[in-house]
Swiss-Prot record:
UniProt region (Mediates binding of host collagen and inhibition of platelet aggregation), positions on chain: 148-269
Reported function: Modulates blood feeding of female mosquitoes on vertebrate hosts. Inhibits collagen-induced platelet aggregation in the host via preventing collagen interaction with its ligands: glycoprotein VI and integrin alpha-2/beta-1 (ITGA2/ITGB1). Inhibits collagen-induced increase of Ca(2+) levels in host platelets. Binds to host collagens. Binds Ca(2+). Prevents a decrease in platelet count in the host blood after collagen injection. (Microbial infection) Does not affect the development of Plasmodium berghei parasites in mosquitoes.
Chain residue ranges for the region called GE-rich region which mediates binding of Ca(2+): 38-148
Disulfide bonds: C208-C261, C230-C239
The protein's name: Aegyptin-like protein
Keyword Acetylation in annotation: no
Compositionally biased region (Acidic residues): 56-73, 98-121, 131-149
Gene that encodes the chain: AAPP
Highest taxon listed in the record's lineage: Eukaryota
Annotated source species: Anopheles stephensi
Span list, region Disordered: 19-152
Tissue expression as described in the entry: Female saliva (at protein level). Distal lateral lobes of female salivary gland (at protein level). Low-level expression in male salivary gland. Not detected in female and male carcasses.
């Protein structure tokens, strides 16, 4: 029994000893396989990561390109919208400006038309007034000459027109002419008009004015001669008044004669 146990023990030891190298080999092989598998897995992971990175880069580039295209399209759309809006705004402004110009032209044309109508009306009114005055003067003259209907207004118009014609002197020297007209206005026109304002029949006093125009013309010519003589003295600054002194005195006498005639004719039957 002891021998059997000893043999069994030896066999067991032999088996154990013989089995240990194979296990180590197996362990080495298994560890080698594991390391190879790990290396392969690591390489696969690197390849996968590189592939993923490349894919991610490509995707990023694609996304960037897509975003750039989208932004470009959006900018183009915005630019187009702005251009369209600008064109519409420009067209609107041009349209408004055109309407304003047309309205301004129509307003100016209307104002010019109104001004023309008013001017035409004014001219027609002036012409009518002048025509009426001429007709009244002509009618007054005819009435006075023919002994028709007369009035103080008619007498006033007749005398006023007659004196205006007398005051239309032909003196060439304007300085002297201003003195002559002032003398005629003061000494002849004003007192005579005041005197005839209440006379109804011009025909009664008409003959008092027969020689008045010639008498005044003679006095004016004498004043022109006196002024020329006075002007020879370059140091005399009073030739205007000195040259018309005789005219002033002569008009006083002539107006007194005219007034006496008018009063006499007015008071006669």
């Amino acid at each position: 029994m002891k021998l059997l146990l000893l043999l069994a023990s030896v066999l067991c030891l032999a088996l154990i000893v013989s089995a240990r190298p194979s296990d180590e080999t197996t362990d080495q092989e298994s560890s080698t396989e594991l390391s190879e598998d790990t290396s392969d897995s690591y390489h696969q992971e690197e390849d996968t990561s590189e592939t993923g990175a490349d894919a991610g880069t490509e995707d990023g580039n694609s996304e960037d390109d897509s975003s750039e295209l989208e932004s470009s399209s959006e900018e183009g759309h915005e630019d187009g919208s702005e251009d369209a809006t600008g064109e519409e705004g420009g067209a609107g402004e041009k349209g408004e400006a055109g309407e304003e110009d047309e309205a301004g032209e129509e307003g100016e044309a209307g104002e010019e038309g109104e001004a023309g109508e008013e001017g035409g009306a004014g001219e027609e009114g002036g012409a009518g007034e002048e025509g009426g005055a001429d007709e009244e003067g002509s009618a007054g003259e005819e009435g006075g000459a023919e002994g028709g209907e007369e009035s103080p207004v008619n007498t006033y118009h007749q005398v006023h027109n007659l004196l205006k014609n007398i005051m239309n002197v032909g003196t060439k020297n304007n300085y002297l002419k201003s003195f002559i007209l002032a003398r005629l206005q003061e000494r002849l026109m004003n007192p005579t008009i005041d005197l005839v304002g209440s006379i109804s029949k011009y025909s009664k006093i008409k003959e008092c004015f027969d020689s008045l125009a010639d008498d005044v013309k003679s006095l004016v010519e004498k004043s022109e001669t006196s002024y020329e003589e006075c002007s020879k003295d370059k140091n005399n600054p009073h030739c205007g008044s000195e040259g018309t002194r005789e005219l002033d005195e002569g008009l006083i006498e002539r107006e007194q004669k005219l007034s006496d005639c008018i009063v006499e004719k007015r008071d006669s039957e």
